[in-house]
A protein has these predicted regions:
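A short, Lys/Arg-rich alpha-helix, primarily the initiator
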Residues: 1-17
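Short, charged recognition helix plus adjacent turn
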Residues: 1-2, 67-69
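Residue-level signal for the short linker/turn that defines the boundary of a DNA-recognition helix
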Residues: 9, 19-20, 46-49
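Residues within the helices of the helix-turn-helix
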Residues: 12, 23, 52
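The alpha-helix within a helix-turn-helix
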Residues: 15, 26, 55
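Short alpha-helical DNA-recognition segment
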Residues: 20-38
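Short, conserved catalytic or interaction motifs in soluble domains
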Residues: 41
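DNA major-groove recognition helix of helix-turn-helix/homeodomain DNA-binding modules
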Residues: 49-64
Length: 69
């Protein structure tokens, strides 16, 4: 069995619930807007530290924001 786990996310939905733009969220967590966009579209997998900071900023548990597909 050679299946690759892909980390998916609900970042865009959680950000919208909080009424935050990509720019505002990026400022809150200390990364570029492009990084937020890349995470939302699955082009970039955040580090454990960034994933935790995103969870805190969006008031979500890790498993509410990220999941394996």
């Amino acid at each position: 069995m050679n299946q690759e786990l892909v980390l998916e996310n609900h970042l865009k939905e959680a950000r919208a619930e909080k009424g935050l733009s990509q720019q505002k969220l990026s400022e809150l967590v200390g990364v570029s807007r492009n990084t937020i966009s890349s995470i939302e579209t699955g082009q970039f997998c955040p580090t454990a530290k960034l994933a935790l900071v995103l969870c805190i900023a969006l008031d979500k548990k890790f498993e509410e924001l990220f999941f394996f597909e």
